[in-house]
């Protein structure tokens, strides 16, 4: 056993308890009042899903610590590792896949079902959708695993000749056992291009994790690439667009009247869509109109919040305005800090992943030096950079949801988040968390070397037949950097401008 095994077990247990409590805290404080004392099954799924997502992110630092406990061993097999990390990785990600593709869709269909229907009919309707999805997924997985569920490792064939053992037994320190001509194996003169392909079938759990990672990587590349730029720049532009002064009472009455009129128009549109839903006319046009109304509702809520900020009321009006000013200053500071982290991420991807050979270990060296300062400092910084990517994914999904009609918006608001939005975001986090771990295991390969995560994500996944070329040519990393650059240019060109009315429910000027 390693020197720090007991401490590692204690830390793992404590972290799991903290994660579970944090998930409950987020649910209680973000849930909508309409969901209080009901929707218990979706709430259980949300808490369990959030816990799995956070634990999966923290498992990579735990994997590194698990390996460091055996750093004095000559080879990995010489140490009895505390935690069976490979089994834990596979178990967590199988649970992750089941939640994303089966449990969360069932909970969403059940929650969004017609409340006027009986409980049994709502369960039956949700089960039909989930069973159909399960059958399709099982067929696709089974066919793909049977046909191309193999890994192809490129190996170099090395061989050497044998030397007859002498029988004279007359040796000295000047006469070695093996002759001078046999000190080098024939591999010393082997052709550098003498490579062969060693194929073997991967295990089914590893194949499920691999395919889930591919699906998550596509979403992670799009949302994460956009989000890593818009997360800090959005905070900075919010500071630039902040209200500079309190408006007069007459201006407030004018704007409030206009917003009230727009709210009534929006309610009429929502009622009309609800009538169409009851009549069964839920076609493509209906879904498009629903998404348009959702976007207009979000914009209306933003306008109301902005109006309340520009005209604080009550006995503590001056205090409220002071907190508003401080809030925007905090956004600016957090935006600057986030911009530094985002630039560090992009720079690390370019100089360590896209340049071959890498120009520098960069953040890997930073984490190692922080570990030398204090044992958990590098691990904490490592976990922070991984969590930052998840925040970027959520920010990117929100931005694209507001800009593109075909992407559904599920905003997270303090004290006003419905369970379907909770479930959607938990599913997105779970799906992208697999890719975040794979991305971090690759990006921080020098720091996380010889871990179980690297064995799964760095060896098996990147050698999987039909998939390996996506990683061989850095498709996801290039897409991530390109989207981040385009988003940055968008904010430079348009982000500093104050928003102008663009729709029927916009705040008037």
Curated annotation (Swiss-Prot):
Residues 251-316 form a coiled coil. It comes from Arabidopsis thaliana. It is found in: Membrane. The keyword Cytoplasm does not apply. The chain crosses the membrane at residues 8-28, 44-64, 90-110, 128-148, 208-228, 332-352, 382-402, 422-442, 475-495. Its main location: membrane. This is LIMR family protein At5g01460. The lineage of its organism: Eukaryota, Viridiplantae, Streptophyta, Embryophyta, Tracheophyta. Belongs to the LIMR family. PANTHER family: LIMR FAMILY PROTEIN DDB_G0283707-RELATED. GO terms for cellular component: plasma membrane. It is a multi-pass membrane protein. Signal peptide: none annotated. It comes from the Eukaryota. Keywords: Coiled coil, Membrane, Transmembrane, Transmembrane helix. InterPro entries: LMBR1-like_membr_prot (IPR006876).
């Amino acid at each position: 056993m390693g020197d720090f095994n007991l401490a590692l077990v204690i830390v793992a247990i404590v972290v799991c308890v903290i994660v579970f409590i944090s998930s409950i805290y987020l649910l209680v404080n973000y849930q909508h009042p309409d969901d209080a004392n009901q929707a218990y099954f979706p709430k259980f799924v949300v808490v369990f899903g959030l816990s799995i997502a956070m634990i999966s992110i923290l498992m990579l630092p735990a994997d590194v610590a698990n390996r460091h406990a055996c750093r004095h061993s000559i080879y990995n097999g010489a140490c009895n590792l505390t935690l069976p990390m490979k089994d834990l990785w596979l178990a967590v990600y199988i649970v992750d896949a089941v939640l994303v593709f089966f449990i969360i869709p069932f909970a969403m269909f059940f929650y969004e079902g017609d409340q006027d229907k009986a409980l049994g009919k709502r369960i039956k309707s949700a089960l039909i959708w989930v069973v159909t999805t399960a059958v399709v997924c099982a067929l696709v997985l089974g066919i793909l695993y049977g046909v191309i569920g193999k890994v192809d490792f490129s190996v170099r064939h090395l061989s050497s000749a044998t030397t007859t053992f002498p029988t004279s037994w007359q040796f000295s320190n000047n006469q070695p056992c093996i002759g001078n001509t046999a000190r080098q194996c024939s591999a010393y003169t082997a052709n550098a291009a003498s490579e062969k392909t060693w194929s073997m079938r991967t295990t089914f759990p590893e194949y499920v994790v691999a395919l889930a990672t591919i699906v998550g990587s596509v979403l992670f590349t799009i949302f994460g690439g956009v989000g890593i730029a818009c997360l800090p720049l959005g905070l900075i532009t919010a500071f630039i667009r902040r209200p500079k002064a309190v408006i007069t009472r007459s201006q407030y009455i004018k704007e409030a009247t206009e917003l009230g009129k727009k709210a009534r128009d929006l309610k009429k549109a929502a009622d009309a869509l609800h009538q169409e839903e009851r009549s069964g006319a839920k076609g493509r046009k209906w879904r498009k109109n629903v998404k348009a109304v959702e976007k207009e509702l979000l914009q209306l809520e933003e306008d109301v919040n902005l109006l309340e900020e520009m005209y604080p009321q009550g006995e503590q009006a001056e205090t409220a305005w002071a907190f508003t000013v401080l809030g925007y200053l905090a956004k600016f500071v957090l935006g600057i800090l986030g911009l530094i982290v985002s630039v560090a991420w992009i720079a690390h991807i370019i100089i360590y992943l896209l340049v071959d050979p890498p120009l520098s270990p960069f953040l890997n060296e930073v984490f190692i030096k922080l570990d030398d300062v204090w044992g958990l400092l590098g691990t904490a910084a490592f976990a922070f950079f991984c969590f930052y990517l998840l925040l970027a994914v959520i920010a990117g999904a929100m931005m694209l949801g507001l800009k593109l009609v075909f992407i559904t918006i599920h905003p997270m608001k303090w004290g006003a988040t419905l369970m379907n939005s909770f479930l959607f975001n938990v599913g997105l986090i779970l799906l992208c968390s697999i890719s975040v771990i794979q991305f971090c295991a690759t990006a921080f390969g020098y720091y996380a070397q010889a871990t179980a995560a690297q064995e799964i994500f760095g060896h098996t996944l990147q050698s999987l037949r039909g998939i390996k070329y996506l990683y061989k040519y850095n498709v996801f990393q290039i897409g991530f950097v390109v989207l981040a650059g385009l988003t940055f240019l968008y904010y430079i060109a348009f982000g500093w401008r104050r928003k102008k009315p663009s729709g029927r429910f916009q705040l008037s000027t």
